Amino acid sequence: MKTPKIGFSLLLFMGLSFTMLHAQNEVSQREVIALLELKAKTKGHLWTNQWDQSQPISTWHGVTIKNGKVVGLDLSNNNLQGRIPITIGNLRHLEVLDLSGNNIEGKVPGLFRKFEKLKVVNLADNALAGNIPTAIHKLQNLEELNLSNNRLEGELPLGISELSKLRTLALANNDLKGPIPMGMEKMKKLKMLYLANNKFSDFDALRKLSKQQLVMTDVMVKEGNLIPLDFTKSPEGLSRLEFEKQE
């Protein structure tokens, strides 16, 4: 007689029940569920730095708690494998989300409308595919967005120019295409821009950005594309502008 398999839901319930005994009212049950499902969906047993569920959540690697809310999640370079579960949207008080340097697959979570307090999103150096969610403009407090070194495709969402507090935008080494959205000049605080090694076809939207005091601009333009004239007139701030031969 075969031993019946224990379903994922039961395992999660068992883990949740055990963890809640030790949570000491640190965070809400909703947030505990989100953390445990992230662990389960990304092979937590293989993580470089694992979570000891017998210990308070505030001691878990990469988890930052403030006033009873999870405000920071930094699991960078921690051997996460798999996909980001939709329940991560339960961490609505997150200010920092850093899952860079792992092997996370699937799409960028389209849950940005729930993360109103996010200031930093770093999902670089993974295997994420698909488009950048159109709801990204909901992150009105975002200061850093790093999606470099993935497999993202499609065009940049038009609303990305509405991220008025953004200081760093890093999208290099993907398969993004089409024009850079107009209105980038509204991003008054943008200091670091990385767009190299994509398939962008029109850089005219960067014309007014070149007048800002950009500390670092990394743009690779394919041969045959037009360069905004202001780049040649006001090269200060441009640290890298290269030409790549059309394949």
Where do the protein language model's features map onto the residues?
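Leucine-rich repeat domain C-terminal region
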Residues: 167-177, 183-247
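Bacterial Sec-dependent N-terminal signal peptides
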Residues: 1-26
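Surface-exposed cap/linker segments adjacent to membranes
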Residues: 23-61
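Conserved positional slot within leucine-rich repeat
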Residues: 74, 98, 122, 146, ...
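Consensus "Asn ladder" position of solenoid repeat domains
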Residues: 78, 102, 126, 147-150, ...
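LRR N-terminal entry segment and analogous cap-like coil->beta motifs
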Residues: 57-107, 120
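Leucine-rich repeat
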Residues: 67, 89-94, 110-118, 137-142, ...
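The feature encodes a structural signal of leucine-rich repeats
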Residues: 84-86, 105-110, 129-134, 153-158, ...
